[in-house]
């Protein structure tokens, strides 16, 4: 197993359909501009309430990716 060094970014994804989709939205967006994504950690979950019901989910994730070179 080789040694790795990871860079971590923190992102917040959102979705009206649930937590899992909010996470997937954050990871998909990160994948558009970052390479070598390796893992994520959910660090916060929030929701927006409207009319007494959950209207929207927000999930903050830390995303780790390996650095190129070296």
Swiss-Prot record:
Q: Which InterPro entries match?
A: Dodecin, Dodecin-like, Dodecin-like_sf, Dodecin_bact
GO MF, one term, reads: nucleotide binding
One family from Pfam that matches here is Dodecin
Segments spanning the bilayer are: none
Instruction: Determine if Zinc is one of this entry's keywords.
Output: no
Does the keyword Lipid biosynthesis belong to this entry? no
Positions with a binding annotation for riboflavin: 39, 46, 58
Alphabetized, the UniProt keywords read: Flavoprotein, Nucleotide-binding
Q: Which domain of life is it from?
A: Bacteria
Subunit notes for this chain? Homododecamer; 12 subunits assemble to form a hollow sphere.
The similarity comment for this entry is: Belongs to the dodecin family.
* Task performed by this protein: May function as a riboflavin storage protein that binds and sequesters riboflavin, thereby protecting cells against undesirable reactions mediated by free riboflavin. Protects bound flavin against light damage; flavin fluorescence is rapidly quenched by interaction with Trp-39.
This chain's protein is named Dodecin
Report the source organism.
Answer: Halorhodospira halophila (strain DSM 244 / SL1) (Ectothiorhodospira halophila (strain DSM 244 / SL1))
């Amino acid at each position: 197993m080789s040694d790795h060094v990871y860079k971590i970014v923190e992102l917040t994804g959102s979705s009206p359909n649930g937590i899992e989709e909010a996470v997937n939205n954050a990871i998909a967006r990160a994948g558009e501009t970052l390479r070598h994504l390796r893992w994520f950690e959910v660090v916060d979950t929030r929701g927006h309430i409207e009319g007494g019901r959950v209207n929207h989910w927000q999930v903050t994730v830390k995303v780790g990716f390996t650095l190129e070179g070296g």
